[in-house]
């Protein structure tokens, strides 16, 4: 039974109903419909913290999905799962792959910056200020890209960039 039929959460049910209606009325191929079904089921599993199941659905959606834009969101969500699992190198890889297909994903740039900032903090704890600065500089570059795409967002990142003198805002 598809995951969307066994979920008891009201929001998830609403999403599933709307998604099912869209699948019926929007002209798409059967492959596109199957890809979206796997993507939808992956999102539902991910929202419940069932990451292994979510990844299985996302990988199947990737196998079926041909549109680069749609693939970017699948890759982004795979990156989110790896971030949640503390697998930062894998997460960065998936965020990069998502951005190759869709360079207008500020949330991917932000998440990459957060990972780099975290690695900088870890380098400080290990007493390696030179490595820390390199990670912080990389975080700054990613945050600048996220902010350029959505200037009103990422206020904390903007403040950090100002405080650390890595970027001046008008």
Curated annotation (Swiss-Prot):
GO terms for cellular component: chloroplast thylakoid membrane; plastid. Gene3D superfamilies: Tetratricopeptide repeat domain. InterPro entries: PSI_Ycf3_assembly, TPR-like_helical_dom_sf, TPR_rpt, Ycf3/AcsC/BcsC/TPR_MFPF. It is a peripheral membrane protein. It is found in: Plastid, Chloroplast thylakoid membrane. Keywords: Chloroplast, Membrane, Photosynthesis, Plastid, Repeat, Thylakoid, TPR repeat. PANTHER family: CELLULOSE SYNTHASE OPERON PROTEIN C, TPR REPEAT-CONTAINING PROTEIN MJ0263. Essential for the assembly of the photosystem I (PSI) complex. May act as a chaperone-like factor to guide the assembly of the PSI subunits. This is Photosystem I assembly protein Ycf3.
